């Protein structure tokens, strides 16, 4: 049964109805509309913690979607799932693919930085200071890129960059 027929959440149901109306009036081809349905169902499943179902829907959407910008968001959402499940390597691959298609995606840059920072913490905990510093430097590079794109966001990252001496910039815009 399609997710749209079993959605009991009022907000999700409202979103689904609105999305269906928009799909009917938008001048998009059938393939693009079908891709959006899979993407929408993927987002709904992801919100409910049904990650395997979400990934299946995102894969279908990715197979159908031709627009690079839209594909970037599908890849980004897939990266979120892999990151939340601890598969950082796959998440990094997907975030990088998303950025290749959409260079103005600060949230993907931020998430890459978060992963490198986490891995840096892991290296520090295992007393590999050199590796930790390398990973923290990578995190800093990605946070700087994200902050340049969205200077009012990522305040904690900006503070971390300043307190660790990894940034001499006071303002990113």
Swiss-Prot record:
TPR repeats lie at residues 35-68, 72-105, 120-153. The keyword Membrane applies. Transmembrane segments: none annotated. It is a peripheral membrane protein. Belongs to the Ycf3 family. Essential for the assembly of the photosystem I (PSI) complex. May act as a chaperone-like factor to guide the assembly of the PSI subunits. This is Photosystem I assembly protein Ycf3. It comes from Cyanothece sp. (strain PCC 7425 / ATCC 29141). The lineage of its organism: Bacteria, Bacillati, Cyanobacteriota, Cyanophyceae, Gomontiellales.
